[in-house]
Amino acid sequence: MIRNTLAFLAILFLLIPTALLIIGSVSVPSTRMTLAKVEGTEFGIFGTCTGNGTDCTETSFGYNASSSLIDDFYYKGDKRLVLSKVLITHIISAFLSFLSAIFVFFSIFLVNQAVNIINIIVVFITTLLTCLAFAIELVLFLPHNTWQSYVTAGAIGSDLIAILALCLRSVSISRIGQKSARLEHVDTMNSSYSSYKTDVKYPLALDDKLSSVPTLPKFHDALTSTSEFGPPSDSGDTVGTTQYPGDIKYATGYESTVASPVPSRVAKLSSRDTPSIIADYDEFRKSESSPSRSSVLSTSKPEVHETEGYCPHKTGNRPGFPSLNIPRTRPTTAGIANTQFDLEPYRNRQAGSISSEGTDSRFFDVENQVSVAQTPSVKPEMFPKTARPFAAIHANASSTQLRNTENITHPGIPNHFAKTTSSVFDEPPATRMPQTRSPVNDHSSFPSDLPIKGEMSTNMTGAPRVGSRNNSSNDLHAQAGMLKNVGNGPRNAPRNNSSNNLHAQGGMPMNMRGPRGAPRNNSSGDLHIQSGMPMNGRNGPRDTSRNNSSSDLYAQSGMHPNMNNGHRGAPRNNSSNDLHAHGGMPVNMRGPRNTSRNNSSSEFNAQIPMNLRNGPRNASRSNSSTDLFGQSGIPGNSRGMPTSPNSRNNSALDLSMHGIPLANNSRQFKRPSYGNMSRPSFELNGSRNPSHGSLNTAHAGMGYGPRSMMRDPQNLSNVPPVSNTLDQLSGNADFELPVRGNRNNRRGPGGNRMIR
């Protein structure tokens, strides 16, 4: 539809310039219409007229005007006669416009891209001629031209619109051409399929189309053919023929046999290429047997032999693999000493070790059997003392005998971990295993109080094996905070050595460096690096003095983000004052409230968000050093609980951590914030684990308790007594804890839960 509309528009805009050009061409001397008029002289395309049209020249192509009249025009050159002859282009343009309209009209009925392109070319030429005629009029008659000369400009515009319409029609024709081409292709495919069904008769009859078909070649012949190209031989291959990567054949001294992957029935034809004639439908209906066994079917009847069916549980009957040669009787005890293992499975055996199918099967032994060959004599160098027959011993010895025998090893591998016991087999002494001592089971070379490898994976209490001081020091470094590393025993038993080794194993999962020196001060100086710091192992002490290590301790212990906080001064009081702000505090880096030692020690425990064990028992240096190494880095040890609320050094320093406010501490405890690197082991009351939330609420005090306890920090009635809290935590009392969440560990409305 759109193509026809565009065609009619093109015809319309081609007829308009035809009419305009005809109007411009009909002028004096034929009519009274003029292109220009100067001093009573009228100019047209074919001549001039004077005296109001009474005196006119003859009609001709080109004319000369008088010299007096030429001076009134812009162009006064000698070429005016030539240009006047070119005015004939008006008539030519009008004719081409009308001819183009006729072509476009006929193209409506003939939808062809080539015809449309020809129309575009003709209209374009017409437009060029019209432009030329309008230009000559302007050159000859300016400034005295009349309105009749400007109608040519309208013809030019109309021709351009016609060209645009024809271009749009060309695009539409190209699209319909592509669509018709696709439809034609589909029609061609459909017609081809229809003609095929017409030519072929359905249903196909065996006697019409498939009266005889060649059979497929034997599979094993195709694999073991002697020629790489061309048909293989009819007869079976023999030993010495060329083998290819796909062959399944093994030279064993006898005639080679090939295991065919065909599982049950194999048809052997007299000739591979002999066609086997298939019966037609009528013969198949009349016969009582299958067509392959009918007497009227084949010229050479195939010989069919039955083979054993494929059984995966039977060793050796796997498709594509030969049968196995395995002695079904186990070797006796008397023949074990004179047994030699065949350690070369790819070496050719003797002719006697052939299976019933004639195939060597050493490489395809899939059962847990041992194929042994009896030899008349065994040389001593061929049978090492430690090479005992592993499978044979297990085959003949009972479970009681195996528990009392030596450890059985693989051939050629000496056993250094075998027990020293007697053998139940009557064999010469030369063939017995060497008696060795096991470093795992022999405890004579180590102290009896030392933790043994393999027994320390679940002991995380840090309790010593024996009550001696050295032994507890030896055991403590291995059990405090070590989840996986259980093999790092002390270098030796002295007390200094355990202190030197303590910094490497206590609470350090990854950094296992040794001490910098043997003195106790050096181990104390290094202790701040490794205790409780999994990844940071570079902040050594400034010097070996005890004061300096205490000054640096607050900056390096447990601080992941802030690793550059040096001590503010060398005095002991200053390091104690700053210790509470930096030791074990990932986010809260507040300074001390005053310079007194008691205040800084008291607030040290209160400003550690979740670490309830790193606080010193009292303000003395020795006690803090004693408690610090045991409690830092132990995940589940909350031994920092106060023992008595009346003791100044012990309870007063620790009570701020457990909810007992101090007299000189008027600042309200705040809810702690956590950084990305130090996440506590359990959250607050909104914990996902209700037991952790309950325990936290029970002994956390005002810093972690309910909102009612945090409203008035000075009101001691809101704080549970320490003795009751200790009784509840030790299991001597029943209490209810506000726990947020239900039994499925989901966040929800809080409630009380009885805990015994």
Swiss-Prot record:
It is a multi-pass membrane protein. Residues 281-328, 427-453, 482-650, 686-713, 735-756 are annotated as: Disordered. It comes from the Eukaryota. GO terms for cellular component: cell division site; cell tip; growing cell tip; non-growing cell tip; old growing cell tip; plasma membrane. Residues 289-300, 485-520 have a biased composition (Low complexity). Its main location: membrane. This is Membrane-anchored protein 1. The lineage of its organism: Eukaryota, Fungi, Dikarya, Ascomycota, Taphrinomycotina. The gene is mac1.
